[in-house]
């Protein structure tokens, strides 16, 4: 038995027939010696952040941010590419997404929710950090260092200039990871104790906030439209590029069934000396896959596949598997030369933003 109680706090105010139905279900489960689970969900007035279940069960449930496809119903835009940009800005945190107005453009949402005086989400990043840590300055510095995209330990250390040794970064990264604000990844071909790790902000909205909104809070000169045009627009594609690869990895993990016949049972990336592969893993069918992601630039012709082949040869991940799929994820319509090169190979595919979003490509 699984009982899901949405807005569980209303149960005590409900009519007796509601509590009677719940009681009868529990009695039946107990009589039949069945395992039963009770899942409760309740509205919170907190503007953003982790929601803790207060009750007698003694459990805490941390809900991850929504994936790109799961967040689509809340994102403004008219094309798949628009939706990728919107996800790169507002991410997948439900308490953020509920404030987004789908009837206006992404730029208008950015101004209204993040840049205008008393904007609803302007202090969201502060609220998340400052209720869990007493001295947030270095935590802000770490998150700001990661806001420009996934990076390594040394780069994070350089972003916190008052720390004299790289080892001093550890407690801040570990605390942020424990709070669910930072994620750590290893290359799929690395051992569990490998120090070759990369760190990223856990949700695109938090990265966007630390990259663009926090500096605005510290310097409010100029109006919101000027800041949007001068500070955000020129760097928005760079920011979205960092998010696009994660969207591609999400697709392989959760939504590849309709294209490749199964989702990935292992999904991540590969990097090392002489190779960098944005999306890689093993499908449920046992086939290995390797893909690179192109948001800003358009891949051209067969040389794009050749470069991917060379990167695959530089590591042994998936070596010996009967089928090894090459994938090119592109945010723009692929040129004819690339389509021809892919069509000549049985183990190569092109995935556009429409497929990632579960709709027709542009």
What are these regions (language model features)?
Residues 6-8:
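Walker B catalytic acidic pair
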Residues 10, 43-48, 66-69, 94, ...:
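Conserved nucleotide-binding/hydrolysis micro-motifs of P-loop NTPases
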Residues 10-53:
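Sensor-1/coupling segment of RecA-like P-loop NTPase cores
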Residues 53, 82, 134-138:
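N-terminal positioning helix adjacent to the helix-turn-helix/winged-helix DNA-binding module
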Residues 59-84:
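Conserved small helical "lid"/interfacial subdomain of P-loop NTPases
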Residues 80-99:
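The conserved phosphate-sensing helix
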Residues 102, 108-276:
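Accessory nucleic acid-recognition modules appended to NTPase machines
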Residues 202-362:
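A cross-kingdom feature that marks ATP-driven nucleic-acid transaction machinery
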